[in-house]
Amino acid sequence: MRTGSNSRQLELRPHECVEIFLISGSPEERGEYAEDVLKNQSARIILCSIQYVQHATETIDFIKREDFRTYIQWLNPGHNDVKTQYWDYLGLISRLMSIGATVSIRSGQGNPTGRVQELREFIYGWAVFRNLIVSC
Protein backbone atom coordinates (compact mmCIF):
# COMPACT_ATOMS: atom_id res chain seq x y z
CA MET A 1 0.00 0.00 0.00
CA ARG A 2 1.10 3.56 -0.62
CA THR A 3 1.11 6.44 1.82
CA GLY A 4 -2.00 8.53 1.37
CA SER A 5 -3.37 11.60 3.05
CA ASN A 6 -6.22 9.71 4.71
CA SER A 7 -6.45 7.01 7.31
CA ARG A 8 -7.84 3.59 6.41
CA GLN A 9 -9.39 0.59 8.12
CA LEU A 10 -7.21 -2.39 9.01
CA GLU A 11 -9.09 -5.64 9.54
CA LEU A 12 -7.53 -7.40 12.53
CA ARG A 13 -10.09 -10.19 12.92
CA PRO A 14 -13.16 -11.05 10.83
CA HIS A 15 -15.43 -7.97 10.87
CA GLU A 16 -13.24 -6.18 13.43
CA CYS A 17 -11.26 -3.19 12.19
CA VAL A 18 -9.26 -0.31 13.55
CA GLU A 19 -8.43 3.02 11.95
CA ILE A 20 -4.76 3.35 11.00
CA PHE A 21 -2.55 5.72 9.07
CA LEU A 22 0.13 4.07 6.96
CA ILE A 23 3.47 5.57 6.01
CA SER A 24 4.75 3.35 3.20
CA GLY A 25 8.53 3.46 3.38
CA SER A 26 10.43 5.10 6.19
CA PRO A 27 10.60 8.89 6.45
CA GLU A 28 14.37 8.49 6.11
CA GLU A 29 14.03 6.60 2.79
CA ARG A 30 11.44 9.09 1.54
CA GLY A 31 13.59 12.10 2.42
CA GLU A 32 10.76 13.46 4.56
CA TYR A 33 10.41 14.36 8.19
CA ALA A 34 7.88 12.23 10.13
CA GLU A 35 6.23 15.31 11.61
CA ASP A 36 5.48 16.67 8.12
CA VAL A 37 3.97 13.37 6.96
CA LEU A 38 1.82 13.07 10.10
CA LYS A 39 0.50 16.63 10.34
CA ASN A 40 -3.29 16.78 10.48
CA GLN A 41 -3.61 13.04 11.17
CA SER A 42 -6.18 11.94 13.72
CA ALA A 43 -5.67 8.16 13.54
CA ARG A 44 -4.62 6.75 16.90
CA ILE A 45 -2.47 4.07 15.24
CA ILE A 46 0.36 4.88 12.82
CA LEU A 47 2.16 2.13 10.92
CA CYS A 48 5.61 3.32 9.89
CA SER A 49 9.08 1.93 9.35
CA ILE A 50 12.28 3.58 10.52
CA GLN A 51 15.44 3.11 8.47
CA TYR A 52 18.51 2.04 10.48
CA VAL A 53 20.56 5.18 9.77
CA GLN A 54 21.98 7.86 12.05
CA HIS A 55 19.41 10.52 11.12
CA ALA A 56 16.60 8.19 12.26
CA THR A 57 17.13 9.97 15.57
CA GLU A 58 14.96 12.79 14.15
CA THR A 59 12.02 10.37 13.89
CA ILE A 60 12.73 9.00 17.38
CA ASP A 61 12.89 12.54 18.81
CA PHE A 62 9.49 13.25 17.19
CA ILE A 63 8.06 10.05 18.73
CA LYS A 64 9.33 11.19 22.13
CA ARG A 65 7.99 14.76 21.77
CA GLU A 66 4.54 13.47 20.78
CA ASP A 67 4.60 10.87 23.59
CA PHE A 68 3.65 8.06 21.18
CA ARG A 69 3.31 4.51 22.49
CA THR A 70 5.78 2.64 20.29
CA TYR A 71 6.06 -1.02 19.31
CA ILE A 72 9.14 -1.86 17.25
CA GLN A 73 9.93 -4.98 15.25
CA TRP A 74 13.60 -4.62 14.40
CA LEU A 75 14.09 -6.77 11.31
CA ASN A 76 17.58 -8.06 11.97
CA PRO A 77 18.82 -9.42 9.69
CA GLY A 78 16.83 -7.38 7.21
CA HIS A 79 15.27 -8.77 4.05
CA ASN A 80 18.33 -8.06 1.87
CA ASP A 81 21.02 -8.51 4.53
CA VAL A 82 23.38 -11.44 4.88
CA LYS A 83 22.09 -13.99 7.39
CA THR A 84 23.98 -12.38 10.28
CA GLN A 85 22.43 -10.26 13.01
CA TYR A 86 23.92 -6.83 13.56
CA TRP A 87 24.62 -5.13 16.87
CA ASP A 88 22.87 -1.84 17.59
CA TYR A 89 25.99 0.10 16.66
CA LEU A 90 24.02 3.36 16.22
CA GLY A 91 22.33 3.02 19.61
CA LEU A 92 18.84 3.41 18.10
CA ILE A 93 17.31 0.47 19.96
CA SER A 94 18.72 1.73 23.26
CA ARG A 95 17.35 5.18 22.46
CA LEU A 96 13.89 3.76 21.66
CA MET A 97 13.85 1.67 24.84
CA SER A 98 14.81 4.73 26.89
CA ILE A 99 11.54 6.39 25.79
CA GLY A 100 9.45 3.33 26.70
CA ALA A 101 9.26 1.54 23.35
CA THR A 102 8.54 -2.17 23.27
CA VAL A 103 11.18 -3.77 21.05
CA SER A 104 11.31 -7.21 19.46
CA ILE A 105 13.97 -8.51 17.10
CA ARG A 106 12.70 -10.62 14.22
CA SER A 107 14.30 -11.90 11.04
CA GLY A 108 13.28 -9.98 7.95
CA GLN A 109 14.13 -13.02 5.85
CA GLY A 110 11.76 -15.82 5.02
CA ASN A 111 8.01 -15.97 5.44
CA PRO A 112 6.64 -12.84 7.19
CA THR A 113 3.38 -14.50 8.33
CA GLY A 114 4.45 -14.99 11.96
CA ARG A 115 5.72 -11.47 12.52
CA VAL A 116 2.71 -9.94 10.74
CA GLN A 117 0.40 -11.94 13.03
CA GLU A 118 2.41 -10.73 16.03
CA LEU A 119 1.82 -7.12 14.93
CA ARG A 120 -1.91 -7.76 14.43
CA GLU A 121 -2.23 -9.26 17.91
CA PHE A 122 -0.36 -6.38 19.53
CA ILE A 123 -2.48 -3.78 17.70
CA TYR A 124 -5.68 -5.67 18.52
CA GLY A 125 -4.91 -5.82 22.25
CA TRP A 126 -3.95 -2.16 22.33
CA ALA A 127 -7.05 -1.13 20.36
CA VAL A 128 -9.51 -3.25 22.38
CA PHE A 129 -8.27 -1.73 25.64
CA ARG A 130 -8.87 1.77 24.21
CA ASN A 131 -12.25 0.89 22.63
CA LEU A 132 -10.98 1.61 19.09
CA ILE A 133 -12.32 -1.54 17.38
CA VAL A 134 -15.13 -0.90 14.89
CA SER A 135 -17.27 -3.24 12.84
CA CYS A 136 -16.27 -3.64 9.18
What role is predicted for each listed range?
Residues 3-65:
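Conserved nucleotide-sensing/catalytic segment adjacent to the nucleotide-binding pocket
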